Amino acid sequence: TDDADPERYPDLYGQLDGEIDAVAGHGTFIAGIVRQAAPEADILSIRVAGALGVVDESTLLETVAQVVTLLARHREDPKTGFPIDVLNLSLSYYHETPIDGLFSLTLYQLLAKARELGCVVVCSAGNDAIDRPSFPASLWSWPGADNGIRRDRDAPLVSVGALNPSAQSVALFSNIGPWVQAYAPGAAVVSTSPAFVGGTQAVTRADVEGLRRETIDPDDYRGGFAVWSGTSFSAPYVAARIAAQLGTVPAVGVSPAAAAKAVAAVLKSLPTPVDLD
């Protein structure tokens, strides 16, 4: 029924609908990308969204605040906290009400503190194929910005859009604009996935000579890998490249100057979309 309580009738929900949730495995997929580009990096993965991809504002702020606290403690005493040199944020939102601006201000202050401590912040630009600034990706002093943010000498905030596999063109879904600093592979990316087996079956099956043959089952990920697209996957590629560029860092952490140098080197090495002009 429409008002069935999932706690009382769990068999009406979940895997029996034959499909996995839209963003199931999002974090696992990102971790796999980081591992591919920076195999020696240590990953601290923190969940902020449910299986439907909705991020609660208070949860995001609380999580980022905890990350900054861990970073600050480690900078004060390397035996405590956690050494966070690059922070990847594969999420985005837009300002819909004046209150959203206040939320972004608080988020900016937290990220500014992390950057002050030498932590590079990498953000996905969004997948809406528009040039409207998304947040937190646009929380920097981009050309023509009216956000009141001034240039500083802290570790950079890097906003990343998605390239097609050819690395010659921007993916059609990727957000664009002067607030997007770099583009990286983000379409048809291969990475790790939870070994999930859904209820949907292959469309066609035709066994021959004792061999089972069938078309791809879109909900069968028992192999542990998947193909996915989005700026959520461009950002961790850049974040991992920056981490690899930093290499082994001092116990006390990375200086903002060293972080900026590493970012500049990585951005310079990324593919550049072909300019029609």
Label every PLM stretch briefly.
Residues 2, 138-247:
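Extracellular S/T/G-rich loop segment that most often corresponds to the catalytic His/Ser-adjacent loop
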Residues 30, 87, 241, 245:
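Terminal peptide-recognition signature
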Residues 48-49, 163:
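Hydrophobic pocket-lining residues within nucleotide cofactor-binding pockets
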Residues 77-91, 156-157, 247-277:
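C-terminal subdomain of the subtilisin-like protease fold in secreted/lumenal serine endopeptidases
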Residues 49-151, 219-236:
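Substrate-binding/access-modulating region of protease and related hydrolase catalytic domains
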Residues 1-44, 59-62, 66-83, 90, ...:
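Active-site core segment of subtilase-fold serine proteases
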Residues 44, 120-122, 158-159, 190:
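Structural detector of well-ordered beta-strand residues that form the stable sheet scaffold
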